[in-house]
Each structure stands twice: as C-alpha cells, then as structure tokens.
Regions:
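Cytosolic covalent-transfer regions centered on His/Cys nucleophiles
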Residues: 1-169
C-alpha cells in the first residue's frame, strides 16, 4: 500500500481531532427541565465559557431544532447538534435527566450535545457520523450514556473512535 504525505497529514488530523473530542467529553446530570427549550439552554451551558457563548450556542441549537426535530423516538433522547463559530474543534456531551421530560408526544430521558466548528472540516463530520452510527447500532452505547459514569462514556467513545482510526490507517 502506497501512503502519501497527504495521507499522513489526514491520519494525523483525524488523531488530533479524536484526542480533542475525547478531552472535551462532558456528562451532566440535571434534576429536572420543564421543556425542550430549557433542555436546549442546559445543553448550551455544557461547553460555554461566557454568557455570549451560551447565547450563540443556544441560538444555533434552537435554529437547528426548528429545521427538524432532533428527537430520536426509539432512544428517547434528543440529538442536539450545530455548527458554531466560537469553537475551533468538536465537542461531545450528554445531559442526563433524573426526571423524564414529557413534551407533546415525546418522552425525553436526556440529550446528546454535539458541537462542530463552523467552516468545519470533513474530519469533524466523519467523527460525529461514527459516533451517531454507534448510537443506532450499539445498544450498549446508549445504556452507557444513560446510566454509567463520565469515564465510562469516554472509554466507550474512545473504543468507537479507535476503530475508525484503525480503519483509516
């Protein structure tokens, strides 16, 4: 197999982005929210560093939700995601609700939060796609998100992304 300098660069970028995502993972437990809008607000706080940043993330998540609902009925979770200018990498987190949120016909146990840098690189999309496919295909991943510790979530995401990395080498 012939490997070019470009291939090495792409593989290195993938590795850097995987490491960055793994370092950013956050799992937060919340006692109660009364609406999807409130859940989105909590999600916007997860990776914020200022009030302006909270507003920007919240606006983008609401904007995305208005395009089409991000509720995954088979999993009883929201998949809150957006592109944002105030970060330069990807972020992944989970908000676990102690009390199920009931809104309209939805029963929501929690929300995955995925932020991708605006002007995102293909590698960001590839990483998030790998995680999202695992949500659908691997029941164990959902169980870990909903019930286990943050370090267990990090370990599972690492396992998923190491497989992606191995396939690319």
């Amino acid at each position: 197999i012939r490997i070019s300098r470009k291939d090495i660069y792409e593989i290195s970028r993938l590795g850097d982005n995987i490491n960055s995502l793994l370092e950013s993972i956050s799992v937060k437990q919340i006692s109660k929210v009364s609406s999807i809008r409130e859940l989105i607000h909590e999600a916007s706080i997860l990776f914020s560093y200022s009030e302006n940043n909270v507003k920007e993330i919240e606006e983008k998540l609401v904007e995305r939700e208005l395009i089409a609902s991000t509720y995954l009925s088979k999993l009883n979770i929201m998949l809150l995601h957006c592109r944002i200018s105030s970060i330069n990498n990807i972020r992944f987190g989970y908000i676990r609700l102690k009390k199920i949120l009931r809104e309209e016909d939805k029963l929501i146990e929690g929300a995955i939060v995925e932020l991708v840098a605006e002007g995102f690189k293909n590698v960001h999309t590839e990483i998030m796609s790998e995680i999202n496919e695992s949500l659908i295909e691997k029941e164990e991943f959902i169980r870990i998100l909903k019930q286990k510790s943050e370090s267990d979530v990090i370990d599972k995401v690492e396992e998923i992304l190491v497989e992606l990395y191995k396939r690319k080498i």
